[in-house]
Amino acid sequence: MHILGIDPGLQITGFGVVDMDGPHLRYVASGTIKTTHLDTKDLPGRLKVLFDGVREVVQRYQPEVASVEIVFVNVNPQATLLLGQARGACITALVSSDLAVAEYTALQMKKAVAGYGKAGKAEVQQMVMRLLKLPSLPGKDAADALGLAITHAHVGTAMARLALASEAGGKMDGNYRAGRSR
């Protein structure tokens, strides 16, 4: 299953694609979508670049699901609003491509990838490189996006299995119910 991670940003949006085959993860691609070539006052133009860029990534790599970082209020409310609009353009591109979208906080991603929620950017980059056996460090934005894809591979698929078990009356693969083996 191909999982697309998106780290939204108005100037630079990171993307990362991993393939999950059972418990194994394999790097597929990563990169950035940049709007820095546009005038900072051209917000609609920047949002269109993000929308089109995310759609292009989806068409190229054909993911089955996407994982996007949740944005929280920063010290600067204007920056938070702009980031929220960038995030909205990315999510709109994903859902218009008929993708399910999972959302995770930066803390959840850092905890899933590095083992604790206060990990710095460099630690996330190092762990992404190790987990995906990359030959070199990915860029910060791409590393965060890959981290979001990894987070969904670990957390999201486990949550989906629990939901399916709940719908099936608490049974998981017919071997377990309420935590006890039968």
Swiss-Prot record:
Positions binding Mg(2+) 2 in this chain are E69
Q: Which residues bind Mg(2+) 1?
A: D7, D141
Its BP terms in the Gene Ontology are: DNA recombination; DNA repair
Q: Where in the cell is it found?
A: Cytoplasm
- Which domain of life does the protein's organism represent? Bacteria
Its cofactor is: Mg(2+)
Q: Sorted alphabetically, which keywords does the UniProt record give?
A: Cytoplasm, DNA damage, DNA recombination, DNA repair, DNA-binding, Endonuclease, Hydrolase, Magnesium, Metal-binding, Nuclease
Q: Which residues form the active site?
A: D7, E69, D141
Give the EC number: 3.1.21.10
Write out the GO cellular component annotations: cytoplasm; Holliday junction resolvase complex
Alphabetized SUPFAM superfamilies for the sequence: Ribonuclease H-like
Recorded catalytic reaction(s): these are: Endonucleolytic cleavage at a junction such as a reciprocal single-stranded crossover between two homologous DNA duplexes (Holliday junction)
Which Pfam families does UniProt cross-reference here?
RuvC
Q: Write down the InterPro entries for this protein, in alphabetical order.
A: RNaseH-like_sf, RNaseH_sf, X-over_junc_endoDNase_Mg_BS, X-over_junc_endoDNase_RuvC
Q: Which GO molecular function terms does the record list?
A: crossover junction DNA endonuclease activity; DNA binding; magnesium ion binding
Its main localization is cytoplasm
Recite the UniProt cofactor note for this protein. Answer: Binds 2 Mg(2+) ion per subunit.
Q: Which NCBIfam families match?
A: ruvC (TIGR00228)
- Describe its partners and assembly state: Homodimer which binds Holliday junction (HJ) DNA. The HJ becomes 2-fold symmetrical on binding to RuvC with unstacked arms; it has a different conformation from HJ DNA in complex with RuvA. In the full resolvosome a probable DNA-RuvA(4)-RuvB(12)-RuvC(2) complex forms which resolves the HJ.
Biological role stated in the UniProt entry: The RuvA-RuvB-RuvC complex processes Holliday junction (HJ) DNA during genetic recombination and DNA repair. Endonuclease that resolves HJ intermediates. Cleaves cruciform DNA by making single-stranded nicks across the HJ at symmetrical positions within the homologous arms, yielding a 5'-phosphate and a 3'-hydroxyl group; requires a central core of homology in the junction. The consensus cleavage sequence is 5'-(A/T)TT(C/G)-3'. Cleavage occurs on the 3'-side of the TT dinucleotide at the point of strand exchange.
The UniProt similarity line reads:
Belongs to the RuvC family.
Protein name per UniProt: Crossover junction endodeoxyribonuclease RuvC
Q: Which gene encodes it?
A: ruvC
